[in-house]
């Protein structure tokens, strides 16, 4: 598993600007200002990031688990292009330690593992640091970085459950589902996971998700994609799993 340099805004965390990953700017300056158009009752419980006309709202633990009027998700051009993003490590949800919005387009979530039990033995809680970095720009950048402090190598799985419902922001606010249109079966090809919606007027909306490194397997459960990496974590050696989400 490859490691990646920690994304950072240049000049200190308090300054807006491009977030740099492995020496490359993920995106440039923020665009329009203003709070994302999500239900007011949900806004206070979410981390909201914005760049231009795109915005993302995630839970304090970094997950997206969209429900009626929850407002969670990745939005572009008034359409929700990502309605679910759930992380588990070793089949368990990470234990949240802290989360913070570093700038209007950049958030960091720190967590640790729950107790993991498997054929190789038990990994005690608070053995693995799990750091999520969320950056919104022309695309969504989502990194899961793991670092084990167990004295021996830990072998475990990392899973992301992903889905896109393509609801528009007015339906999210008012609770409902658009009539007409068709959600096609998700697919995985050439290292990319794709979700496609064809509106009643024939317009196509697509969510394309890049995964690096290549996952061990990708399974489907209806409109959900289950992405699984089998990872080895030597003591103190970081492992980075990177997800990019593009909305068309």
How should each PLM-predicted stretch be described?
Residues 2-248:
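Terminal accessory carbohydrate-recognition/targeting modules of carbohydrate-active enzymes
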